[in-house]
Curated annotation (Swiss-Prot):
Gene: rcf1
Membrane topology: Multi-pass membrane protein
Stretches assigned to the HIG1 domain: 9-102
Gene3D superfamilies, sorted: 6.10.140.1320
Annotated region described as Disordered, given as residue ranges: 1-28
Protein task: Cytochrome c oxidase subunit which plays a role in assembly of respiratory supercomplexes.
Record-annotated membrane-spanning stretches: 39-58, 73-90
Protein name: Respiratory supercomplex factor 1, mitochondrial
Organism of this sequence: Schizosaccharomyces japonicus (strain yFS275 / FY16936)
Length: 106
């Protein structure tokens, strides 16, 4: 007599977002990120762009232009980090306000 293993239900790795979309797909995650924190992907793209232009300038031997683009990269990175920190604080503030609305009687 062969033993049968119990049937295990599948594990759901992520919960649907407020809009009902599943965030496991890349396009869903990107849409969610652009909607909630649009400055972060823009800052990342600016950082990568500045780095690529600096690399191109180095290959062409234009060190002054390369240094200028490296400075732009640093500024773009700083702006991205500030956007991340600001987003974290805003998210925390929104959660606290939502919690206070639930606690406070009307």
């Amino acid at each position: 007599m062969a033993k049968t293993s119990p049937v295990v239900p599948p594990i759901k790795l992520s919960e649907p977002t407020e809009s009902g979309n599943d965030t496991t797909e890349t396009s869903g995650r990107l849409k969610h990120l652009f909607r909630d924190q649009p400055l972060i992907p823009i800052g990342c793209a600016a950082t990568v762009g500045a780095f690529l232009f600096a690399t191109r300038a180095i290959r062409r031997g234009d060190s002054m232009r390369a240094n200028r683009f490296f400075r732009y990269r640093v500024l773009a990175q700083a702006a991205t980090v500030l956007a991340i920190v600001g987003g974290v604080f805003m998210e925390r503030k929104m959660k606290q306000e939502k919690r206070m609305e639930q606690i406070t009687p009307k």
